[in-house]
């Protein structure tokens, strides 16, 4: 059983995908999205979290990609928790703007620093996207 059940969004622009950094600049990069609240559908959660984190943007062409499970990103290396992410791909309509809970938005590409990524991105999500030819560059 996962300690955190989340919904995440994978969106591309010019061959790069959008990631965010929460809390502080030392935090790992994660996908936009968040935890599903009690009684909330996956669609409702994704829409709410994207608006909370990226501002008033709209989502189009949203489609399920897969469910991934791995160690949760943590600023404290002694904390070991499991996160499960239901990942959806989609297009953002509008300009994403970092909210109060996000300190930085990054369009991550082949020249970006992989060491900044959360464990689930490095270990599970990106290898799967490469295997499925959804990501054309190697990490």
What are the roles of these predicted feature ranges?
Residues 69-96, 110:
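Active-site-adjacent beta-strand/loop module that shapes the phosphate/pyrophosphate-binding cleft
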Residues 13-56:
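Conserved Nudix-box catalytic region and its N-terminal flanking loop in Nudix hydrolases
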Residues 57-67:
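A short coil-to-beta-strand element that immediately follows conserved catalytic motifs
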Residues 89, 97-130:
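NUDIX/MutT-family hydrolases
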Residues 13-16, 23, 91-95, 110-112:
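Short loop segments at secondary-structure junctions
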Residues 1-17:
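Conserved N-terminal beta-strand and adjoining loop/helix that marks the start
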Residues 9, 46, 64, 87-88:
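A structural signal for short, well-ordered beta-strand segments
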Residues 36-37, 70, 112-113:
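Short histidine/acidic/glycine/proline-rich micro-motifs that form metal-
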């Amino acid at each position: 059983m996962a300690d955190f059940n989340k919904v995440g969004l994978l969106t591309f622009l010019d061959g790069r995908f959008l990631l965010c950094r929460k809390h502080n600049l030392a935090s790992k990069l994660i996908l936009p999205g968040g935890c599903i609240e009690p009684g909330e559908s996956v669609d409702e959660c994704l829409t709410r979290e994207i608006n909370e984190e990226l501002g008033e943007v709209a989502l189009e062409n949203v489609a399920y990609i897969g469910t991934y499970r791995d160690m949760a990103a943590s600023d404290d290396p002694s904390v070991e928790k499991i996160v499960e992410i239901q990942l959806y791909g989609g297009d953002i309509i509008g300009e994403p703007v970092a909210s109060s809970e996000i300190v930085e938005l990054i369009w991550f590409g082949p020249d970006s620093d992989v060491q900044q990524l959360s464990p689930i991105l490095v270990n599970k999500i990106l290898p799967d996207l490469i295997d499925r030819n959804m990501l054309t560059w190697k990490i």
